[in-house]
Amino acid sequence: MSYYTLPPIDPIIMSLGPISIRWYGLMYVIGFFATYFLVRQQIQRHQFTQLEKNFDNLNTVLILCVILGGRLGYVVFYNLSYYLQHPLEILATWHGGMSFHGACIALILGGLIFCKIKKIDFWATADVYVATIPIGLGLGRIGNLINGELYGRVTEQPWGIIFPNGGPLPRHASQLYESLLEGLILFIILWSLRNRPWKRNSLTPHGTILSLFLCLYGLFRIIIENFRQPDPQLGFIVAHITMGQLLSGAMILCGLTLWFWRIHQKKRATAL
């Protein structure tokens, strides 16, 4: 059987002196801009003046959270022993190594602290933002595909792809699977439900979209990890379970706990 061979693609689009513009970085930038404009649209629609006054400052904080949290998450979750021996490599983000789970933790903590200081409704803010996050996730996986990294396990399926750095055998294009599930499909679901928390339903209080995001992303990631090649420095953590699946399972538990807690809070507030 003949399989498609992914040609080697230069990860650098262009260089301007010492500055290199990379495909992966470009995907991040497009994701940030998409989030910026869609969130601003929602702020104006729902007249969320608390957030509107602090919008640009919060965006700056969240961008830093993505970069710092994503990098530190990779260091801690995926290669801690290496970075303890080579601490300066933690700063070398251009060598690759970002974790969405780390970025997610940093985004929630950073957003929570900012909203508390500025006296903004955190749960409403989180719902507005997370409905757009799958755009960046989907684009990021396209960047991984272009870089020929994070490829899937060996397969005999006719849609297998031979990757430049993946050896001679065809593999699952797990980057495309993730881009579809964690990107397009997750975005369609969250975006279609984005207005529910504003309708004062006791089953969909503010925080519902965040809860749903945690649950669905966790579920989709667990599914895709069955096709994705485990990180070589870690392999399987327990039996055939990867680090990504363990972290995603924790996300699902957090999402369910948060949703039930927010419903309980909403019912108590209504009773009063």
Curated annotation (Swiss-Prot):
The chain crosses the membrane at residues 19-39, 58-78, 94-114, 207-227, 234-254. Keywords: Cell inner membrane, Cell membrane, Membrane, Transferase, Transmembrane, Transmembrane helix. InterPro entries: Lgt. GO terms for molecular function: phosphatidylglycerol-prolipoprotein diacylglyceryl transferase activity. GO terms for cellular component: plasma membrane. One of its GO terms (biological process) is lipoprotein biosynthetic process. This is Phosphatidylglycerol--prolipoprotein diacylglyceryl transferase. The gene is lgt.
